Structure formats: C-alpha cells, structure tokens
C-alpha cells in the first residue's frame, strides 16, 4: 500500500502511539522526494513540461495548501512534486528541466514526530503489534480498569476537510486487559480481515447502545482468498474438538483452565467443562503433547477436521451443472462458444483432489437439451443429445448418465464441449425456458446437492418462471421505479428456498444487451449462497469482453467453495444475534444455511444486548461447518474478543467507520428492496444527522463552537461514505440508470467483502502524470508494486493536462485531460497525437519506455484484490476517457467523483452544509 499522505490528527487521536497509521514525518523543509532547487534530483527523469505557476507543488497542491487556524490538526502535507507531465508553458521549450518546488510538511509536535519515526522504523502498522496505550485519566463512572481504552479525539469536519487517506487507516485497536487470553499469542484475537466489529469497545447495556445511535454488528468474511494455499489457516487434524456442554461454543484462546488443567471454563456462558482425554496427546507421534502449542488455544482463526458425528450423510462431491442458454441471442453474441471453450480450458482448475467431482450440461432454448456423455474408453465416445419439449413437467430421460464424473469422462467431456457450439450454430429460436431448465436441473442434482451455474443472454420468456419486459423508461427516477426492483414472479423466491433445503446453490452469469430482469433472477443466488455476475451489452467479438469473462469464469470454476455449509455466531451471555444480512437462507433464528459457501462474499450480523454485561471482555465466535471440495467435513472457527465499557466516549472512540458503513450499506439495500429507493436514501441522511447530533449533544458539550461540525477523528470518513452510498449506482436518484444495472449494483452493495465495498462506494483515484518516483515500481522490502497516494474524488483535484486512474473495483477509467501534452500521449499510448487516441474499453498498449511500464503496473496493481486481503474473481474493464471526448463516457466517469454535484445530487460541501443545518 502506498503510505497515507501524512499526519492523521497527531496521533493522540485514538489514544495510541504516534506510529498508528501515520507515516514517518519528513524534515520540515523538504517533502519526500522533492530535491531542493539546486540539488540534483537523484535518478534522471524525463520531464515533459515545467510548471507554469509556483503555488504549492504539482496537481495535488490542494491536499495540503492552507493550514487550519491554530495548525494543531496535522494537515496533509502537499504531494511531493514529481516533475512529471505538467502543464505546457506556452512559447517555452517543453523539454526544459525545472526543479520541483519543495513542499512543506505539516507542523507536528517534536515528541510526536520523534515517536512516529521510532514506531515507523519498528514497522508498527499492524494493530495487533501496537505497544501499550498511553494512559488516559479513567472516567468517574467506570470501574477502575487495567488498561485505558481508545481516547476520543474531536475534530471539526468543516475546518479540517476529509482526506481520502483516512479511509486506509486500520480500525481503532482492540484494547484488552492483560492476561485475557490463556497463552500470550500474537494471534489470539481475530484479525480484521476475517471479522470486524462496528464497535471495538462494547457498551455494557442496551440503553447505552441505544443512546449512542451507533449499530453493534459484525462484518464477517470467513475466507480471505479463493484458494486455501493463498491464505492458509492452522488446522486441528486430531478430531479432538472440545465444546461447551451448554452453549456449544468451541474451545478458544480466551477460555480459562481450572483444576490443574483438567477442566476449562467457557468464556461465553461460564460453565465448567471437562478437558477431553486426548486433548494433550499427539496422535501423529503417539506421545504426550504440549497443550500450549495447540492451534485452537493460540489462534483465533482455526479449522477443525470434523469427526463422524458432524455428518448427516457422507460428504457430498463437488457437482457443477451448467445451464447454458443456446437461443439466438446467446449464439450470435458468442456466449455459447466462449463458455464451451472456457469450461474446456478450465477442466484442470476445477477442484478434484478426491476424484469425485461431477459435471452435467443442459442446453436451453424453447426446449431442454440433455447430454449423455459416455466414459472414456467406451466403444462410442459420441455424446448423445436428448431433447425434452414438455416444459411444465420436465422429466429426466436417463437420470444415470446425465451427471458424469470428471475423472472418468475427461476426454469425452472435451469432445462434447468442442461440438457444443456446432450443434446450435444455425438456431433461430428466440425462446428461453430457463425456469423450466432450473426445475429440471434441480431434479437431476437434488439427490446429491451441488451448484447450478446459469449462463444466459435472454430473458426467461416461456415455461416456469417466465418473465416479461417490464422496464418502462418513464418510471425511472420516480417513486414507481422501486417496483421494478422487486421480483416479478414468485417462482424465483419459492424455488430458491426449495434449492436451499436440497443443498443446491445457483449462480447467475447474465449477458443481455436488452432488459433481462436481474431483479427477479438475482433472488436465486440471494437465498442459496450464490452470486449474480452481470455483463451488460457483452459481446465476444470485442476481445476485452471475451477475455474478461474467460478470466473471471475460469477463476470462478477454480475457487475452493465449501459445500452443505451452515454458519452460526455465538456470544457471551447477554448478547444475542439479532439480524443476518447476506446471500443465504436464514433457516432458524440463528442459523444461516449455505448449499455452497463462496469465498468472495461478506456477511453482516447485527448483535442485540439483552441483559447487562458484567464482564470486562465479551467474545463473539463465528463457526462455519462445511464440506471442503476434497470431501472433508470441517469447521472454521473465528473468535473475536472485545473490551466492554459503560462510557459513551469509549464507544465513539472505538467505532470502526468502515464496518459501520458496511452495516448501513446492507441496511440500505434491504430498505430499497422493501420500501423503495427514496426511503433508503432518506434513512442514510437521517442516520448521519442522528450520529452528528448525538455526538454534539452527549460528547461535545452541546456547543456550536464557531459554527463547526464536531465528530471524532476515527469516524471522520462516515459522512462522506454515507453521501457516496446515496450517490452509488444502486441507490442514487436518476432517470438514466437501467433497472438491471441498478439491481446488479444492489447485489454488490450487499455481498462485497469490506475492502472491495469501500472502494465500490468511494472509488480510488490516482494522479499518474505526476506520480512519485517510486510509484509503479516494486517495493524494495516486499516486492509489491507501489501505488501513488490516492486523491479525493473531486473535479477540483483534476488538472486539464493530467492523466488519472479512477477505479471502483468493478470498472477502471483512465482519464486523459484535454490539454495533455503530446509527449504524455506518446509515452503512455504510443501515439503521435491525442486525436488518434480512441476512447472506450481497451487494454493499455505495451510501449517501450519506463513511464508506460509504470502506468501499466499501477493499473494492474489497483486490480489486485489479493493485496487487499480478499478473494474475488472480478477483472475490471479499463475505459479510456478523454475529457473533451465522448460525452456519455465522460459523464459516466464523472459519476465516480462523489464529492462533486451531479445528476440531481449534492456536492460534498453542500452535503456537509445541510448536515450542519440539521444538526
């Protein structure tokens, strides 16, 4: 990650050492990388044009120009100027060298700067490795405690404007009393990439939680990668699983041992349990084991290999049933050919370690076409096609041969996939009986369970679940638009529940250039633990479209999903799981059922406080019981410990703004689908006002000092994130957004893992024409490509001669300013003249110069979800946008600038003003 741009409030902010989140300060005179006027500037660089003005440094001078009165809140120092592609000086030689103007670092108290450097040198950025907190005076109301919690650091949102770097800071640290865990392991508490709490200090009473107006919820992402090898967690292989007899919690690093280690006290419900006899025995070496080395007592994230009693039936094999649309639309846009080729080329990537993986294929137009594929080595290797035209009661012609074992039929599956396209190349059918195909597929795989993968370019228009073209341009942007986001046919909800009960999950890959009713179709993935992938206007004739889908679909097939899974969250007595959000079926009050457990989604669980909590620490434990794709039954357990408090200031000082925003994103989607878009937007604005008012009344003494807007440092990004949500494609008020695009966006807002959701709500923007010397090159320590510092999403940050990358994780825009110098165009695109530059979807050319390599490295690194600690199959399209080019494309890119006014919505300045008035 690129270092943030400078001093967060000089870190007394959270009551932690200065090293927390703040980069090492530069000596006051020079900004990093800015040689003094006379100095040689290190490595020789090509300079495209000098800067015509000398206010600030580079295009991003606005980031740190004027210090607030008093200068106490460290403003972000200006970007070090890379004398890069600057504004051409008319009449001057555009190749002359001009040294960069030195930037000035923010004033910081010497002690803070010193500490910052010490901690910076120690590499203390991981919140788990932070030294003990500086002691704050204990509030009177609170019983004396061993460790003070995070301190509240008030800031003014109006005089100290939001800086995008604040969104990259880690959440406020979880401060536990010494000796909370049974062994002093650095891995005892759950890392934020798996579970984040909206509150890292939990109110002891429901009334205090209510008073705070903050939500108490967990954001849970049990897997941080598509494959175990990319994110291994400790496995307990001995099948000795110790659980509390009463509340069924799993033994974890926060239990207490009693009676010379023969018994353990549950940290959730306080019951004393016996330690199993084999707990201290090493089955592999057949000798006594050291208990203090057991993974389940040292690691908050572990996986247990489950014994027989955790299985209702033998572990199910991995089953993929492909339902492929072969109607005219799907053949002409190249979907059928691309899908067949992609499956064929990905057969080796489909998990099959136990050699039990099974595949099946049903082609769909006005009839259902089943395929019987013989075993390799049979006399006849030809696949047989069986056509069923009865769509109301589809039956299975020969149930035995329609699902085949990949290992036994590998060669004949390849022969079949090679021929699939030819079979339908002359089709004229516009009908698509996908609902009937889903019913038939369910019949075929429900005895074993598995995944139905739907690939379709058409609206299901005959048979079960048939849908009609109901989008009406006249209702877009009005209150009636919300009805288009509801399901048009009850089949999609009732059938999804049936699927869930039979361990059948559905994924939708949708490719239509016309209305496809994503709102209805997305219900199937929503209730079966699947996902909806939407490719509007896709056509294989465009290389970029074909490559994007092929890469994503291949990664999708290779992903190590869990099967027949259930998720449950248990917690300390007094806490109760109240509401669950995400793609699954809520089978009972606290059990979420997943026929397949994906690796690229997150879930939100709201926690209620039913009775006063008397303990100094509460624990919340998530358990996912599942079958791996290799046929092994396992339980992944994630245990999070949080301190408690009776003090509202502690609650606010420890709130995690990104987790809070994730919770409200899920709430807003639920509200949009149940009540409509306007109520969802209003609820977000009301909540922002409520939080600001509560903070002012309860913690800022109710004063309206100088007309400011007070809010704690750790929550400064929240009002901006709320505005960005209201302006997101899924929720914003507009008469220009096709319903399918909106429905697909709502799917993302309610499933994306937290880092990707934050980027989808508030995209990243990087200035490339003047990026620092190190950007786009590997970091010397880690080897990871360094990104330039992100800049705020405001057109004020964009200069007319600049080159910018804007990336929301789903789509990337490369913005070329209208006055970009010819040298920049030549270096990046290999073209003599900007007029030759075509706009739209494309890949950047490989031009033989260092700057082109660095720009391409930044574009690629910005797509790298692994470095964000998440699994994802998405490969964003890159669109080249000229500021003076195609207006539709330019307007689309500008909707990403969420701090600007646009299309019926307010700017950030107006939004802050309206919040200030209402508070």
Swiss-Prot record:
Positions bound to Zn(2+) = 244, 247, 266, 269
Mark out the compositionally biased spans (Low complexity).
1-38
Which residue ranges are recorded for the region named Disordered? Answer: 1-43
Its chief place of residence is: cytoplasm
Please state what the protein is called. Protein transport protein sec24
Q: What SUPFAM superfamilies does UniProt report for this protein, alphabetically?
A: beta-sandwich domain of Sec23/24 (SSF81995), C-terminal, gelsolin-like domain of Sec23/24 (SSF82754), Helical domain of Sec23/24 (SSF81811), vWA-like (SSF53300), Zn-finger domain of Sec23/24 (SSF82919)
Gene that encodes it: sec24
Tell me the keywords, alphabetical order. Cytoplasm, Cytoplasmic vesicle, Endoplasmic reticulum, ER-Golgi transport, Golgi apparatus, Membrane, Metal-binding, Protein transport, Transport, Zinc
- The species is Aspergillus niger (strain ATCC MYA-4892 / CBS 513.88 / FGSC A1513)
Q: What does this protein do?
A: Component of the coat protein complex II (COPII) which promotes the formation of transport vesicles from the endoplasmic reticulum (ER). The coat has two main functions, the physical deformation of the endoplasmic reticulum membrane into vesicles and the selection of cargo molecules.
